[in-house]
């Protein structure tokens, strides 16, 4: 017996009904981005693995556990992209776009992470991604956060989310804080989870993200980053808060919200929800002024961005999306097909969606049409062909018309 082929675990087909929702989400988000000056771009799904090794760090969960990386036929290590930001910055550098800064980019498409599949978390999933590159300052961060809010509003889910906000401060603030955090955690080293013990020496701030209950109890009394802000860091965060208040953006300051990579600074944020269980983050981002230099640029490039998971957005609510119902053309006999094709072609040039139903018995063809919940059927038989007419049945009104092409066009475009 032939093996029944299935998609890989954690990877799903997007069938038409799924794709309709995805397309709706993408179009809504794109339209909001246009109002903020964002332009769409695309990068390859496959990149050299070193692009992500540099951007995420080899000790990160994504690189050490989740990345799809393999040796290609040229003996190069390549990877399916696990996120967009590194790809966008790589593109900025390789296309020498630095002299055109500032730039605002919108991207969308699949990303890949080898994770345990569950509701709202797949191994292939799709993201909306926004990057504002070459602009610094709290005003830029406020504008980016307002963009995120407006996207969630356009998708009718903003009311079910909470903006969690924090400042990572400047390099000096984080350096002092990291030292104090390590001193505190060293006293509990034997009680930490195995994963956090590894992070303690490589990336201690990532311990604050730990899901371990034991770790969380220890972290509850750990020093807080805001206690070590420089004056510059305090002023930056206070300015951001002022702008958000002016814009009417609601937020909750979460002092434990961090990013564990050195190139992140100042603003970090997540939009979370209680509607999706453990997969509570809908949209997340932050400022990453140090990434471009890590990836080979001569200088640091200020930047801020965020990504949102399309599948998670789709789980937040049901979208009633109207779609164009095609008109069905049904030639009665084989000798009516040529005339039917002429009619179909003429109607399509008038931007009317048409499906020709010519296969099988009339009863089966009619059943397929009923299953599509169509409104109009055009019957073409010998009489219609001889008189150069069309018989149109309106299934919703239960009415029938025999008209010429011009009248048919008028009727179908109402």
UniProtKB/Swiss-Prot annotation:
Q: Which reaction does it catalyse?
A: tRNA(His) + L-histidine + ATP = L-histidyl-tRNA(His) + AMP + diphosphate + H(+)
Task: Give me the Gene Ontology terms describing cellular component.
Answer: cytoplasm
* Keyword Ligase (UniProt): yes
Q: Which GO terms describe its biological process?
A: histidyl-tRNA aminoacylation
Which PROSITE patterns does this entry report, sorted A to Z? AA_TRNA_LIGASE_II
Report the main location listed first in the record.
Answer: cytoplasm
Instruction: Kindly list the places in or outside the cell where this protein is found, as annotated in its UniProt entry.
Output: Cytoplasm
| Pfam hit, one | HGTP_anticodon
Its EC number(s) = 6.1.1.21
InterPro entries in UniProt: aa-tRNA-synth_II, aa-tRNA-synth_II/BPL/LPL, Anticodon-bd, Anticodon-bd_dom_sf, His-tRNA-ligase, HisRS-like_core, HisRS/HisZ, HisRS_anticodon
GO molecular-function annotation terms?
A: ATP binding; histidine-tRNA ligase activity
Do the record's keywords include Repressor? no
Q: How does it assemble?
A: Homodimer.
Family to which the UniProt record says this protein belongs: Belongs to the class-II aminoacyl-tRNA synthetase family.
The protein in question is named Histidine--tRNA ligase
């Amino acid at each position: 017996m032939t093996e029944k082929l299935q998609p890989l675990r954690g990877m799903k087909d997007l069938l038409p009904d799924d794709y309709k929702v995805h397309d709706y989400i993408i179009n809504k988000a794109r339209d909001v981005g246009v109002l903020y000056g964002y332009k769409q771009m695309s990068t390859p799904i496959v990149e050299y693995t070193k692009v992500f090794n540099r951007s995420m760090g080899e000790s990160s969960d994504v690189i050490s556990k989740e990345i799809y990386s393999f040796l290609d036929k040229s003996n190069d290590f390549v990877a399916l992209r696990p996120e967009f930001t590194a790809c966008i910055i790589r593109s900025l550098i390789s296309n020498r776009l630095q002299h055109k800064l500032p730039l605002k980019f919108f991207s969308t498409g699949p990303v890949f992470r080898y994770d345990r599949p569950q509701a709202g978390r797949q191994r292939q999933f799709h993201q909306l991604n926004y990057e504002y590159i070459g602009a610094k300052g709290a005003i830029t961060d406020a504008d980016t956060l307002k963009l995120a809010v407006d996207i969630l509003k356009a998708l009718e889910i903003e009311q079910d989310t909470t903006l969690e906000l924090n400042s990572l401060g400047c390099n000096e603030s984080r350096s002092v804080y990291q030292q104090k955090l390590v001193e505190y955690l060293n006293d509990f080293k034997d009680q930490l989870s195995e994963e956090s013990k590894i992070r303690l020496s490589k990336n201690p701030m990532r311990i604050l993200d730990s899901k371990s209950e034991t770790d969380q109890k220890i972290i509850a009394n750990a020093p807080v980053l805001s206690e070590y802000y420089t004056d510059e860091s305090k002023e930056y965060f206070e300015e951001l808060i002022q702008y958000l208040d002016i814009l009417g953006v609601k937020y909750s300051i979460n002092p434990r919200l961090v990013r564990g990579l050195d190139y992140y600074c100042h603003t970090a944020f997540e939009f979370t929800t209680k509607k999706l269980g453990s997969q509570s983050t809908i949209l997340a981002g932050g400022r990453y002024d140090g990434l471009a230099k890590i990836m080979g640029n001569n200088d640091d490039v200020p930047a801020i961005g965020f990504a949102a998971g399309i599948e998670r957005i789709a789980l937040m609510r049901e979208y009633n999306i109207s779609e164009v119902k095609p008109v069905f053309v049904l030639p009665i006999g084989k000798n009516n097909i040529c005339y039917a094709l002429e009619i179909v072609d003429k109607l399509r040039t008038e931007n009317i969606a048409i499906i020709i139903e010519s296969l099988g018995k009339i009863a089966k063809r009619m059943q397929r049409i009923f299953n599509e919940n169509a409104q109009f059927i055009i019957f073409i038989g010998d009489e219609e062909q001889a008189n150069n007419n069309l018989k149109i049945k309106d299934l919703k009104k239960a009415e029938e018309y025999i008209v010429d092409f011009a009248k048919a066009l008028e009727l179908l475009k109402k």
